[in-house]
Amino acid sequence: MIQVQTRLRVGDNSGAKELMCIKVLGGSMRRYASIGDIIVASVKEATPGGVVKKGDVVKAVVVRTKKEIKRKDGTYIRFSENAAVVIKDDRSPRGTRIFGPVARELRDKDFMKIISLAPEVI
């Protein structure tokens, strides 16, 4: 569960290291985002020479959450950190590599490019 002011690690090589959620997209009073949801975030920490800089406002898709999510078969999945991938307006990733595992739920939300770049899909 990601809400406003939540800090997330970045799971790609776009140049950002840490993001802070400033808005959860999808409804006027929507409070929480989970895996596969799009957020608007501010870059709080970035690497020099990256595509995005500190202070940039970007869109990102949540790929890992510490809060478990229930699957249709009754199993739960959770990760050790909150992480997101910076995306463009056409929902494709800004970076060219994805780091760490991502959840299978991204396939249902049509983030196929992220799924194909990820080293592990859980």
From Swiss-Prot:
What SMART domains does this protein's entry cite?
Answer: Ribosomal_L14 (SM01374)
One MF annotation (Gene Ontology) recorded for this entry: large ribosomal subunit rRNA binding
The source's domain of life comes to Bacteria
Q: Which UniProt keywords apply?
A: Ribonucleoprotein, Ribosomal protein, RNA-binding, rRNA-binding
**Which InterPro entries does this chain map to?**
Ribosomal_uL14, Ribosomal_uL14_bac-type, Ribosomal_uL14_CS, Ribosomal_uL14_sf
Q: Which is a Pfam family this sequence falls into?
A: Ribosomal_L14
- Cellular component terms, GO, for this chain's entry? cytosolic large ribosomal subunit
Has keyword Thylakoid? no
Q: Which GO terms describe its biological process?
A: translation
Against PANTHER family, the record matches this protein to: 50S/60S RIBOSOMAL PROTEIN L14/L23, LARGE RIBOSOMAL SUBUNIT PROTEIN UL14M
Briefly, what is this protein's role? Answer: Binds to 23S rRNA. Forms part of two intersubunit bridges in the 70S ribosome.
Could you describe the subunit structure of this protein? Part of the 50S ribosomal subunit. Forms a cluster with proteins L3 and L19. In the 70S ribosome, L14 and L19 interact and together make contacts with the 16S rRNA in bridges B5 and B8.
The family classification in the record reads:
Belongs to the universal ribosomal protein uL14 family.
Q: What is the name of this protein?
A: Large ribosomal subunit protein uL14
Give the species this sequence originates from. Desulfitobacterium hafniense (strain Y51)
